[in-house]
Protein backbone atom coordinates (compact mmCIF):
# COMPACT_ATOMS: atom_id res chain seq x y z
CA UNK A 1 0.00 0.00 0.00
CA UNK A 2 1.32 3.44 -0.98
CA UNK A 3 0.19 6.73 0.56
CA UNK A 4 1.06 10.21 -0.67
CA UNK A 5 0.78 13.37 1.41
CA UNK A 6 0.02 16.90 0.20
CA UNK A 7 0.42 20.06 2.29
CA UNK A 8 -1.92 22.76 1.01
CA UNK A 9 -4.07 25.80 1.61
CA UNK A 10 -6.57 25.13 -1.18
CA UNK A 11 -7.50 28.81 -1.10
CA UNK A 12 -9.51 28.11 -3.12
CA UNK A 13 -9.48 24.54 -4.39
CA UNK A 14 -9.21 24.73 -8.19
CA UNK A 15 -8.55 22.68 -11.31
CA UNK A 16 -4.79 22.77 -10.77
CA UNK A 17 -5.27 20.97 -7.45
CA UNK A 18 -7.59 18.40 -9.02
CA UNK A 19 -4.95 17.82 -11.72
CA UNK A 20 -2.26 17.37 -9.07
CA UNK A 21 -4.22 14.72 -7.15
CA UNK A 22 -4.99 12.77 -10.33
CA UNK A 23 -1.35 13.05 -11.47
CA UNK A 24 -0.09 11.83 -8.11
CA UNK A 25 -2.17 8.68 -8.18
CA UNK A 26 -1.16 8.04 -11.78
CA UNK A 27 2.58 8.58 -11.36
CA UNK A 28 3.19 7.14 -7.89
CA UNK A 29 0.60 4.36 -8.07
CA UNK A 30 -0.60 5.57 -4.66
CA UNK A 31 -3.60 3.89 -3.10
CA UNK A 32 -4.44 6.91 -0.94
CA UNK A 33 -3.79 10.65 -0.87
CA UNK A 34 -3.84 12.44 2.50
CA UNK A 35 -3.96 16.24 2.66
CA UNK A 36 -2.75 18.47 5.50
CA UNK A 37 -4.77 21.62 4.84
CA UNK A 38 -4.98 25.08 6.39
CA UNK A 39 -8.21 25.75 8.25
CA UNK A 40 -10.25 28.95 8.07
CA UNK A 41 -7.14 31.16 8.13
CA UNK A 42 -4.20 30.97 5.74
CA UNK A 43 -0.73 32.51 5.38
CA UNK A 44 -0.41 36.15 6.47
CA UNK A 45 -3.41 35.55 8.75
CA UNK A 46 -5.96 36.16 6.02
CA UNK A 47 -9.33 34.38 6.18
CA UNK A 48 -9.79 31.73 3.51
CA UNK A 49 -12.31 32.67 0.82
CA UNK A 50 -14.34 29.52 1.54
CA UNK A 51 -14.57 27.67 4.85
CA UNK A 52 -12.42 24.66 5.62
CA UNK A 53 -15.31 22.20 5.36
CA UNK A 54 -16.19 23.27 1.82
CA UNK A 55 -12.55 23.14 0.71
CA UNK A 56 -12.14 19.70 2.29
CA UNK A 57 -15.32 18.52 0.56
CA UNK A 58 -14.00 19.70 -2.81
CA UNK A 59 -10.67 17.94 -2.26
CA UNK A 60 -12.40 14.70 -1.29
CA UNK A 61 -14.70 14.90 -4.31
CA UNK A 62 -11.64 15.22 -6.57
CA UNK A 63 -9.71 12.20 -5.33
CA UNK A 64 -8.25 12.99 -1.90
CA UNK A 65 -8.98 10.27 0.66
CA UNK A 66 -8.44 12.14 3.94
CA UNK A 67 -8.10 15.83 4.81
CA UNK A 68 -6.45 16.84 8.10
CA UNK A 69 -6.37 20.39 9.47
CA UNK A 70 -3.02 22.10 9.84
CA UNK A 71 -3.07 24.07 13.14
CA UNK A 72 -3.73 27.78 12.65
CA UNK A 73 -0.46 28.72 14.37
CA UNK A 74 1.45 27.14 11.48
CA UNK A 75 -1.11 27.75 8.73
CA UNK A 76 -0.68 31.51 9.27
CA UNK A 77 3.11 31.39 9.56
CA UNK A 78 5.88 31.86 7.00
CA UNK A 79 6.59 29.29 4.28
CA UNK A 80 9.36 27.79 6.45
CA UNK A 81 7.11 27.06 9.44
CA UNK A 82 4.13 26.13 7.27
CA UNK A 83 6.25 23.50 5.52
CA UNK A 84 7.92 22.30 8.72
CA UNK A 85 4.57 21.72 10.45
CA UNK A 86 3.13 19.74 7.55
CA UNK A 87 6.24 17.60 7.20
CA UNK A 88 6.36 16.95 10.97
CA UNK A 89 2.71 15.87 10.94
CA UNK A 90 3.21 13.44 8.07
CA UNK A 91 6.47 12.10 9.52
CA UNK A 92 4.84 11.36 12.88
CA UNK A 93 1.94 9.60 11.19
CA UNK A 94 4.46 6.99 10.07
CA UNK A 95 2.49 5.87 7.03
CA UNK A 96 3.29 8.46 4.34
CA UNK A 97 5.49 7.24 1.49
CA UNK A 98 5.63 10.36 -0.69
CA UNK A 99 5.33 14.09 -0.14
CA UNK A 100 4.05 15.63 -3.35
CA UNK A 101 4.21 19.31 -4.22
CA UNK A 102 3.89 21.44 -7.33
CA UNK A 103 6.94 23.24 -8.66
CA UNK A 104 7.80 25.50 -11.56
CA UNK A 105 11.00 23.46 -11.86
CA UNK A 106 10.61 19.77 -11.03
CA UNK A 107 14.36 18.98 -11.14
CA UNK A 108 14.63 17.34 -7.71
CA UNK A 109 18.44 17.24 -7.74
CA UNK A 110 18.66 21.02 -8.11
CA UNK A 111 15.97 21.71 -5.53
CA UNK A 112 17.62 19.26 -3.11
CA UNK A 113 21.01 20.88 -3.58
CA UNK A 114 19.67 24.30 -2.62
CA UNK A 115 17.61 22.87 0.25
CA UNK A 116 20.70 21.14 1.62
CA UNK A 117 22.70 24.37 1.68
CA UNK A 118 19.87 26.32 3.30
CA UNK A 119 19.32 23.58 5.89
CA UNK A 120 23.00 23.21 6.81
CA UNK A 121 23.94 26.89 6.40
CA UNK A 122 27.70 26.37 5.92
CA UNK A 123 29.89 29.09 7.43
CA UNK A 124 30.91 30.55 4.06
CA UNK A 125 27.24 30.81 3.08
CA UNK A 126 26.38 32.53 6.38
CA UNK A 127 29.25 34.99 5.98
CA UNK A 128 28.18 35.90 2.45
CA UNK A 129 24.55 36.27 3.53
CA UNK A 130 25.49 38.63 6.36
CA UNK A 131 27.60 40.75 4.01
CA UNK A 132 24.76 41.22 1.53
CA UNK A 133 22.25 41.95 4.30
CA UNK A 134 24.56 44.62 5.74
CA UNK A 135 24.75 46.16 2.27
CA UNK A 136 21.02 46.77 2.55
CA UNK A 137 19.73 44.03 0.29
CA UNK A 138 16.43 42.41 1.24
CA UNK A 139 16.56 38.84 2.46
CA UNK A 140 15.44 37.05 -0.76
CA UNK A 141 17.99 38.97 -2.85
CA UNK A 142 20.74 38.48 -0.26
CA UNK A 143 20.00 34.75 -0.09
CA UNK A 144 20.30 34.35 -3.86
CA UNK A 145 23.60 36.24 -3.93
CA UNK A 146 24.94 34.25 -0.96
CA UNK A 147 24.04 30.98 -2.67
CA UNK A 148 25.75 32.10 -5.87
CA UNK A 149 28.83 33.03 -3.87
CA UNK A 150 28.86 29.69 -2.07
CA UNK A 151 28.27 27.63 -5.22
CA UNK A 152 30.92 29.51 -7.19
CA UNK A 153 33.52 27.77 -5.02
CA UNK A 154 32.21 24.35 -6.09
CA UNK A 155 33.02 23.57 -9.71
CA UNK A 156 30.65 20.59 -9.64
CA UNK A 157 27.73 23.00 -9.28
CA UNK A 158 28.48 25.20 -12.26
CA UNK A 159 25.01 24.45 -13.62
CA UNK A 160 23.52 26.41 -10.72
CA UNK A 161 25.73 29.48 -11.16
CA UNK A 162 23.49 31.10 -13.78
CA UNK A 163 20.13 32.86 -13.95
CA UNK A 164 18.60 29.45 -13.26
CA UNK A 165 19.40 29.86 -9.57
CA UNK A 166 17.53 33.16 -9.50
CA UNK A 167 14.59 31.51 -11.25
CA UNK A 168 14.55 28.64 -8.76
CA UNK A 169 14.37 31.05 -5.83
CA UNK A 170 11.99 33.59 -7.34
CA UNK A 171 8.90 31.48 -7.99
CA UNK A 172 6.46 30.75 -5.14
CA UNK A 173 6.05 27.02 -5.62
CA UNK A 174 9.79 26.40 -5.95
CA UNK A 175 10.36 28.39 -2.76
CA UNK A 176 7.78 26.33 -0.89
CA UNK A 177 9.11 23.10 -2.40
CA UNK A 178 12.61 23.95 -1.15
CA UNK A 179 11.14 24.54 2.31
CA UNK A 180 9.52 21.09 2.20
CA UNK A 181 12.87 19.54 1.28
CA UNK A 182 14.60 21.48 4.07
CA UNK A 183 12.01 20.24 6.55
CA UNK A 184 12.41 16.64 5.42
CA UNK A 185 16.16 16.92 6.01
CA UNK A 186 15.93 18.61 9.41
CA UNK A 187 13.25 16.16 10.61
CA UNK A 188 15.27 13.17 9.44
CA UNK A 189 12.14 12.04 7.63
CA UNK A 190 12.08 8.91 5.48
CA UNK A 191 9.31 10.35 3.27
CA UNK A 192 10.27 10.57 -0.41
CA UNK A 193 9.75 14.01 -1.99
CA UNK A 194 7.90 13.97 -5.31
CA UNK A 195 7.67 17.28 -7.22
CA UNK A 196 5.13 17.65 -10.01
CA UNK A 197 5.65 20.27 -12.70
CA UNK A 198 3.00 22.97 -12.61
CA UNK A 199 0.96 23.19 -15.81
CA UNK A 200 -1.41 25.83 -17.14
CA UNK A 201 -1.47 29.28 -15.57
CA UNK A 202 1.51 30.55 -13.64
CA UNK A 203 0.85 31.58 -10.06
CA UNK A 204 0.88 35.29 -10.89
CA UNK A 205 -1.15 34.94 -14.11
CA UNK A 206 -4.42 36.86 -13.78
CA UNK A 207 -6.23 35.17 -16.68
CA UNK A 208 -9.00 33.20 -15.00
CA UNK A 209 -10.05 31.65 -18.31
CA UNK A 210 -6.94 29.49 -18.62
CA UNK A 211 -7.47 25.71 -18.41
CA UNK A 212 -5.74 25.07 -15.07
CA UNK A 213 -6.56 28.26 -13.19
CA UNK A 214 -4.52 28.95 -10.09
CA UNK A 215 -5.30 30.66 -6.83
CA UNK A 216 -3.77 34.05 -7.61
CA UNK A 217 -6.00 34.66 -10.64
CA UNK A 218 -9.12 33.65 -8.73
CA UNK A 219 -8.23 35.75 -5.68
CA UNK A 220 -7.39 38.79 -7.81
CA UNK A 221 -10.71 38.51 -9.61
CA UNK A 222 -12.54 38.41 -6.28
CA UNK A 223 -10.57 41.36 -4.90
CA UNK A 224 -11.31 43.37 -8.04
CA UNK A 225 -15.00 42.48 -7.87
CA UNK A 226 -14.72 40.52 -11.10
CA UNK A 227 -13.31 43.47 -13.03
CA UNK A 228 -9.89 42.04 -13.99
CA UNK A 229 -9.46 41.67 -17.72
CA UNK A 230 -8.41 38.38 -19.32
CA UNK A 231 -5.81 38.07 -22.08
CA UNK A 232 -8.67 37.82 -24.55
CA UNK A 233 -9.54 41.44 -23.74
CA UNK A 234 -12.86 40.77 -22.06
CA UNK A 235 -13.66 41.06 -18.36
CA UNK A 236 -14.58 37.64 -16.96
CA UNK A 237 -17.82 37.33 -15.05
CA UNK A 238 -18.22 35.09 -12.04
CA UNK A 239 -19.70 32.33 -14.22
CA UNK A 240 -16.12 31.59 -15.26
CA UNK A 241 -15.51 30.18 -11.78
CA UNK A 242 -17.52 27.13 -12.81
CA UNK A 243 -14.74 26.31 -15.28
CA UNK A 244 -11.94 27.11 -12.84
CA UNK A 245 -13.23 25.19 -9.82
CA UNK A 246 -14.71 21.68 -9.52
PLM segments and residue spans:
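A glycine-rich helix N-cap at a beta->alpha junction
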Residues: 56-71
Amino acid sequence: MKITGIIAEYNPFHNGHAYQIAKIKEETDSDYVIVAMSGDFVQRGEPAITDKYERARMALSCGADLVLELPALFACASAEYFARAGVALFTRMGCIDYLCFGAENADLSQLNKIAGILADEPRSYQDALNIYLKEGKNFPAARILALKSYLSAESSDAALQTEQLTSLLSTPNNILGIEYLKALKTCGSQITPYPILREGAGYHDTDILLKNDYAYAILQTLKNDGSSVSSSGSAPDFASFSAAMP
